[in-house]
């Protein structure tokens, strides 16, 4: 079941990957967790459907900051 965060839905796809969608199901992108020597970080990637590719938005120390990129 998706988790709603201020009109954005997060669908957990795996231990370290979430799909970010609008409530109507339109996919905005993905957030992936990864390890660094300083601790876990979160990478936000916007999906460009017409170009069939992803564009990195940024890397963040807090998952909510990564999700905020899609608002």
Feature-to-residue mapping (PLM):
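Short aromatic-glycine-(Arg/Gly/Cys) micro-motifs in beta-strand/loop hairpins
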Residues: 28-53
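A broad, structure-centric signal for solvent-exposed, well-ordered loop/edge residues
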Residues: 17, 27, 38, 64-67
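Negatively charged, low-complexity tracts enriched in Asp/Glu with abundant Ser/Thr
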Residues: 1-23, 50-57
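A short, charged, amphipathic alpha-helix used as a generic interaction element across diverse proteins
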Residues: 49-71
């Amino acid at each position: 079941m998706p988790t709603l965060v201020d009109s954005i839905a997060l669908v957990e796809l795996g231990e370290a990957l979430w799909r970010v969608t609008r409530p109507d199901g339109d996919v905005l992108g993905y957030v992936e967790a990864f390890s660094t020597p300083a601790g876990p970080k979160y990478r936000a990637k916007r999906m460009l459907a017409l170009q069939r590719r992803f564009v990195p938005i940024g890397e963040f120390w807090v998952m909510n900051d990564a999700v905020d990129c899609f608002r």
